[in-house]
């Protein structure tokens, strides 16, 4: 039984992490899941939240994801995220401004399409702010 597996975290924009991991914790829709080497194969949806990565001989890394898919094979784990941002790169001021703008658009009740877009942006900004608070509590 191996002590590490290969992890890829990718979004439509870029590859955020590609390398060895000892374990990860990911925000699956069914609740947080912990993945160790030789885990039973699994395919599940993930929700907005923080993926925690324990890599050998490195500091733990946190990556914010806004949803997507998690595929687990015994020696390879892949996270295909809608959006992925390293925890240290999350911008609280930007998220607060996006939240404020989305709320303002929703108040003005423009078209249904603009309302739906603003609602999605509000959900994204709120999830990023929650991730920032969670990381702050952990001392990052």
Curated annotation (Swiss-Prot):
The question of whether Transmembrane helix is a record keyword is answered with no
Domain of life assignment: Bacteria
Q: Which InterPro entries match?
A: ATP_F1_dsu/esu_C_sf (IPR036794), ATP_synth_F1_dsu/esu (IPR001469), ATP_synth_F1_dsu/esu_N (IPR020546), ATP_synth_F1_esu_C (IPR020547), ATPsynth_dsu/esu_N (IPR036771)
Q: Does the keyword Kinase apply?
A: no
Keywords attached to this entry = ATP synthesis, Cell inner membrane, Cell membrane, CF(1), Hydrogen ion transport, Ion transport, Membrane, Transport
GO function terms (MF aspect): ATP binding; proton-transporting ATP synthase activity, rotational mechanism
Main subcellular localization, coarse class?
membrane
Oligomeric form and interacting partners:
F-type ATPases have 2 components, CF(1) - the catalytic core - and CF(0) - the membrane proton channel. CF(1) has five subunits: alpha(3), beta(3), gamma(1), delta(1), epsilon(1). CF(0) has three main subunits: a, b and c.
What family name appears in the similarity comment? Belongs to the ATPase epsilon chain family.
User: What is the name listed in the Swiss-Prot or TrEMBL entry for this protein?
Assistant: ATP synthase epsilon chain
């Amino acid at each position: 039984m191996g002590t590490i597996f290969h992890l890829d975290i990718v979004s439509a924009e870029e590859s955020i992490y590609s390398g060895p991991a000892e374990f990860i914790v990911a925000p699956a829709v069914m609740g947080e899941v912990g993945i160790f080497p030789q885990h039973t194969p699994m395919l599940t949806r993930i929700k907005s939240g923080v993926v925690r990565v324990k890599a050998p001989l490195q500091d733990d890394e946190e990556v914010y994801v806004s949803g997507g898919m998690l595929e687990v094979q015994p020696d390879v784990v892949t996270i295909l995220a809608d959006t992925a941002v390293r925890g240290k790169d999350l911008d609280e001021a930007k998220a607060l401004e996006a939240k404020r703008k989305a709320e303002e658009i929703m108040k003005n009740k423009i078209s249904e399409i603009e309302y739906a877009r603003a609602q999605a942006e509000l959900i994204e900004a709120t999830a990023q702010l929650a991730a920032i608070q969670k990381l702050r509590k952990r001392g990052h």
